[in-house]
Amino acid sequence: MAFNDDNFMLKNEAAKRLYQQIKDQPIFDYHCHLDPKEIFEDKVYDNIVDLWLGGDHYKWRLMRANGISEEEITGSASKLDKFKAFARTLQRSYGNPVYHWSVMELKNVFGVCELLTEDNAEEIYHRINAYLVEHQISPRKLIADSLVRFIGTTDHPLDDLAWHKRLAADDTFETVVAPTFRPDEAFIEHQCFADFVARLAQATGRTITDFKSFIAAMEERIAYFAENGCKASDISFTEIVFEAAEPEQLDHLMTRVLEGYQPQPLEIKQWQTAVFAELCRVYKHYGFVTQVHFGALRNNHSAIFNKLGADVGVDSLGDQAALAINMNRLLDHLVQRDSLPKMIWYNLNPSYNITVANTLANFQANENGIAGYLQFGAGWWFADTKLGMISQMNALAEQGLLANFVGMLTDSRSFLSYQRHDYFRRILSTYLGEWIEEGEVPEDYQALGSMAKDIAYNNAIQYFS
């Protein structure tokens, strides 16, 4: 069987027919971690390592598993040596999604059809570097060549959004680059919480002395983001919690934390519940899609974290007790307060997929006729795999309406990661094609093709409008 050809990952004839209907659709990448400054400056790359390996903790994680020294991963080894070290790892990474992503990127972006190995790494390294310069490969070219129509970046609440403003004013660049409000530091367990409150007060010109004034200042920043094209918020929680607290408790807690007090687990849960509920109220007012990533246990290798910082490949999927109870209580609390915005929930631990999909189905009712008001998001991070995608789609199809799914996102720091949209579309086509082949749905390529098109692109446009 041929590998990585036009029918890559398409397991049956039905899949091939469905894929033909969606393969050339544009991309609506509603959540990523790209830097808008890099998009605006649009510098031409001259080395594949900067573009392909820099900041890619997926690849770093595999390289460590293959015994590669840190010197050749994040250290001061030459770029050629780092490329060779990754090639040595890639040829042993069968079964890992990084293998599929990498061979797709090499072929579809750089025209490298042969498999990268330690033996041919140096020749391919120099060939790609020449290609980068000859074809003037830059962020905007990669975006345009991938037919990306929308990019949702991830941004600090105090960001002045200067680069987003410059991009919006640039008539030569057609892709919309919108900010996303990501207030991680608004939660008291964050080591930068006190500094964040001080900077928030300075940015808004407000005196922040209690919970109410804190939320008012946050609302001002949300309004600023809305004025500058923001369509969504995002947050990452280790666990989904629900613990009610009185305003006086929150005021007292905030005062103590700002004085250096280390909050206890119950207090962290109370603050998370209260702040998130208030933010959701404001998000709904401004029409933001509220994205919730949960279940990551971060920075587990303390030595590597202390040396390199966060997002370097030492994170895990977590677990938690009473997810169903907490998630249902939280969503019901938002409904009772008329504060339930459109939401996308990304679950990191696939063992909770049915729980999440089932819970979201309880709260789909809305007065605006929005299909899929609460979304079960695509497989995230460690679940961004073939089996992870299928598990998520299985749970959504069985517990809700897969046809209303807003589909794929890169959630990536790499301008090469748009190949993941094609990877998802191939897996989606096979998934739906198997339904046809096994007689589980009518052999109606117009209906199934329309469903595939909606999931691949159309639903996201409508949902974020």
Curated annotation (Swiss-Prot):
Catalyzed chemical reaction(s): D-glucuronate = D-fructuronate; aldehydo-D-galacturonate = keto-D-tagaturonate
Which pathway does it operate in? Carbohydrate metabolism; pentose and glucuronate interconversion
Keyword terms: Isomerase
Q: Does the keyword Isomerase apply?
A: yes
Annotated InterPro entries:
Metal_Hydrolase, Uronate_isomerase
SUPFAM superfamilies with a match to the protein in the record: Metallo-dependent hydrolases
Q: Is Cytoplasm given among the entry's keywords?
A: no
What EC number(s) are associated with this protein in UniProt? 5.3.1.12
Gene Ontology biological process terms in this record = D-galacturonate catabolic process; D-glucuronate catabolic process
The UniProt entry's sequence similarity note says: Belongs to the metallo-dependent hydrolases superfamily. Uronate isomerase family.
Q: What is this protein called?
A: Uronate isomerase
Show the Gene3D superfamilies listed in the entry: Metal-dependent hydrolases, uronate isomerase, domain 2, chain A
* Molecular-function GO term, any one: glucuronate isomerase activity
